[in-house]
């Protein structure tokens, strides 16, 4: 039994050592950078926000999602009233967001959306103020529908504010 354990440990050490050598032999940064492909734009209308101050985790703000529209290559439709963006802010200028809502395509297909992200007010390396707002929406579409591809990809998004639209505009890209 002791011999068997020793052999397993020796084999594990050799395998780990080999993989370490392989990792160290790679060049950094990697030669390949993931590509992004535009997927859709969401124009989200919002209701009046309310906050729960001083929770054990920070300040919780809830922003109702009241509707809107979306459009991209091969998909178009409306944002369903009834979702919300749940934000949790700390005292260091960082906010975690989690928006949960549904969209409905023009051909009647409902798709669930869960969008998690970070809003941060900080400073760059030179000390200048910087604003960071990125999120990663996940889609849950009927698997056998023409929108099933939304289930099998990673997405990133960032906001765009315009004076013409009083909500938030989110531009969404698929990571190829």
Residue ranges and their predicted role:
Residues 9-19:
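Bacterial N-terminal signal peptides
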Residues 26-176:
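Beta-strand-enriched cores of mature, soluble protein domains
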Residues 1-9:
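Bacterial N-terminal signal peptides that target proteins for export
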Residues 20-25:
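Sec/Tat signal peptide C-region and signal peptidase I cleavage site
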